[in-house]
Amino acid sequence: SGSVNVSDTNSGTITLTDTTNNQNIIFNGNVTADSFVTAAQGYDIFLNGNATFANAVTFQNTGTLDLGNTTSDTFTFNGGVTENTGGTVTIDGAIVSSNDVISFGNINLGQNLSVTSAGGAISIGTITATSGSRDISITSSGGSANTVAVGAIGGSGNINTVAITSGTLTTLNGNITTDNSSGNSVTLVGTTTNGANITIDTDNTSNDGAINIAAFSGSNNNLVLNSGTAEITLSGAAFNLGSGSLTTTGD
């Protein structure tokens, strides 16, 4: 069978069971639901408007997942969200949760990305963008589980600014690389640690970017900061790499 297209939806529970493999289930309007239930089947999900879900959502379809098609699209998961899909995940817009967990694997950006939890832990794998010059803002503050963990960011280019704020701890599990666009920068607010040897690289052909880190907690891994001719600011009182080393190249 072909794609399933759904217009504006307001429902207690939306359950997606199965389609023929590689077919699309497309929500072209806004979605409001208490529960949104998916199955581990080979269909693709497209949510092309704003969406609000009262309960926790787990995306477990084995096809692709597309959340949004414009920067203004907002997805509010009041019970948190977990992404366990088997295909490509593309986010265009904002992900919001009220004091609940936000968990994604690797994601691709079609627009700028904003991820905010009012106190819940945020975990994201690698973040890439195939076009444009995208801005990333990730914030978990308030509450008691206000941590952020992210994989590599910008390895394929097209990432302009990265701003991460955590109330407790941000863990970097991969390198961060910004593109050669004016205004590119990396800003880490709160305490940061690195789960592996990490390089933050804003050194570009004609537009070097500033690196700002508020505080660092020892992980015994090495940290390399390369900003070309732009400033590196280590502003916090606490900057402890344990037995790891810090290498800086910049002003």
Residue spans of the language-model regions?
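Extracellular lectin-like interaction modules
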Residues: S1-D251
